[in-house]
Amino acid sequence: MSFEISVEEIEELIETGNLNIDHALKELGATSQSSLNKPPSQSSRTEGNDGGTKISRNPAPVEAPAHTSTAQRSHNEENESGRQNLDSLSMISNKPQTGTLLMGSDTQLPSPSKTYQGLILDAKKRALNEPRRDQKITNEHGSMNDTRIFKRGEYRYQERGLGYTESEIKNTTPTPRHRREYSISWVNGRTTISEWCNPCCAPVKSTASVEKCTCGRCPKICELCIRDP
């Protein structure tokens, strides 16, 4: 099965294509592109001596609008500015980004558990580096070096470890000196550790408090609290 196309049909198809191209260029208001730069072929039919039909094509350039109209150009500029404004107002850019925090604060606070552990380690290091005082206590068991570090609630057990009986602990007059106390609190989302000295004759309380000397023999300042502000 074969198809034959006459010269008239070919010319009609070419003219129809040219009209479509011109109409598209006028609607878009764009200059002629490289893909549309092909010149339309205008066919002219000539009669040869041999009675045959010859087709000669004369290229003619396509006349595209040299520039867009003022209204079309202003419309394009408004659309472009509108897109830029929308991009600037949007929280998420339409362009791919890596390593950019779109919302939230720039810095992240450490978790309370990590902060608490770090403060505890610092307090332990300070306690180990603080100088200890050697005080001699004379009783029926003889002379001993007292290098105890006071801890809340452990004073009675330390006395037992040195050989004191329960009655001796109750009747013994405390040695005039200071004891170091600590308080751990949670303030404004952070763990804070406070430390201070209290006279040993003052009672030990469950709440943090600064006590005064009751025996009149405890020093006002010791080696531990001399560095306190």
Swiss-Prot record:
Residues 30-112 are annotated as: Disordered. Blocks host interferon signaling. Residues 30-46, 82-112 have a biased composition (Polar residues). The keyword Metal-binding applies. InterPro entries: Paramyx_V_Zn-bd (IPR024279). Zn(2+) 2 binds at C201, C213, C215, C218. Keywords: Host-virus interaction, Inhibition of host innate immune response by virus, Inhibition of host interferon signaling pathway by virus, Inhibition of host MDA5 by virus, Inhibition of host RLR pathway by virus, Inhibition of host STAT1 by virus, Interferon antiviral system evasion, Metal-binding, Viral immunoevasion, Zinc. It comes from the Viruses. One of its GO terms (biological process) is symbiont-mediated suppression of host type I interferon-mediated signaling pathway. GO terms for molecular function: metal ion binding. The keyword Cell inner membrane does not apply. Belongs to the paramyxoviruses V protein family. This is Non-structural protein V. It comes from Human parainfluenza 4a virus (strain Toshiba) (HPIV-4a). Zn(2+) 1 binds at H178, C197, C222, C225. The gene is P/V.
